[in-house]
From Swiss-Prot:
Its main location: virion. This is Virion membrane protein OPG141. It comes from the Viruses. It comes from Monkeypox virus. One of its GO terms (molecular function) is ATP binding. The keyword Transcription applies.
């Protein structure tokens, strides 16, 4: 379900990502990507285990 604020939220996130893409170093980008992937993977594992129990 798409709410009224979601396109604005996506636009703000996209603008922030583009801004950070030019301002932060490559090592920091890799660290951020690794942290986000780790959080998503842990959430997926907990969600899978919870739904299997």
């Amino acid at each position: 379900m798409i709410s009224n604020y979601e396109p604005l939220l996506l636009l703000v996130i996209t603008c922030c990502v583009l801004l950070f893409n030019f301002t932060i170093s490559s090592k920091t980008k890799i660290d951020i990507i690794f942290a986000v992937q780790t959080i998503v993977f842990i959430w997926f594992i907990f969600h899978f285990v919870y739904s299997a129990i």
